[in-house]
Amino acid sequence: MATVLRIDSSALSNGSHSKALADFFQTQWLEKHPTDSFQTLDLSQTPPPHLSEATIGAMFTPTEERSKEQTQQLALSTDYIEQLKKADVILISTPMYNFGIPSTLKAYLDHSLRVGETFVYTDKGPKGLLEGKKAIVVAASGGDYTQSPLDAMNFVTPYLKTALGFIGIEDVTLVEAPGMAGDEASINKSIKQAKQTLQNCL
């Protein structure tokens, strides 16, 4: 039985294309793998705080030297990391906000990319500790940033692929749904293509 960690980041509770595609994937996955389980983290409902000076200080304090207060400061970060470690598949759904990911998703990653927990530094450079996992990134955008020259403005999928690879998750499938601010025909075509890509991930 596999565990899928689903992370939604759209601020919209209704009308989110990225969440709708994640819903589609979850339904299709469970039909094919009925004994698997999904753990959902909706960052719009439980937004993580941005990193503080105290949190950063605790992160870089050796475990054996941390005070009780520092350990408590890292409680949310530790919870996120444990969820990632237990997951076999990570599903991230995100819109594009001003060329990048929502600040909630960035804050989540800031808490999750932690030295000694999800990556370490070696003589050969940084090494990710979450190898062997698969990630699927569903990214929706109002415009089409998949082709030149607008692809240079896309800081969503390149960043997420880099961040996931940094912690050892190299098997990343990018599912993009561009043109969500276009006409109905264009939207339907984009969603259909995204769903086909998602079905190929089952």
UniProtKB/Swiss-Prot annotation:
The organism's place on the tree of life at top rank: Bacteria
InterPro entries xref list: Flavodoxin_fold, Flavoprotein-like_sf, FMN-dep_NADH:Q_OxRdtase_AzoR1, NADH:quinone_OxRdtase_FMN_depd
Enzyme Commission code(s) on record: 1.6.5.-, 1.7.1.17
UniProt catalytic activity: 2 a quinone + NADH + H(+) = 2 a 1,4-benzosemiquinone + NAD(+); N,N-dimethyl-1,4-phenylenediamine + anthranilate + 2 NAD(+) = 2-(4-dimethylaminophenyl)diazenylbenzoate + 2 NADH + 2 H(+)
A GO term, aspect molecular function: oxidoreductase activity, acting on NAD(P)H, quinone or similar compound as acceptor
Binding residues annotated for FMN, in chain numbering: 10, 16-18, 96-99
Cofactor(s) listed: FMN
Keyword NAD: yes
Keyword Oxidoreductase: yes
Family: Belongs to the azoreductase type 1 family.
Function: Quinone reductase that provides resistance to thiol-specific stress caused by electrophilic quinones.
Protein name per Swiss-Prot or TrEMBL: FMN-dependent NADH:quinone oxidoreductase
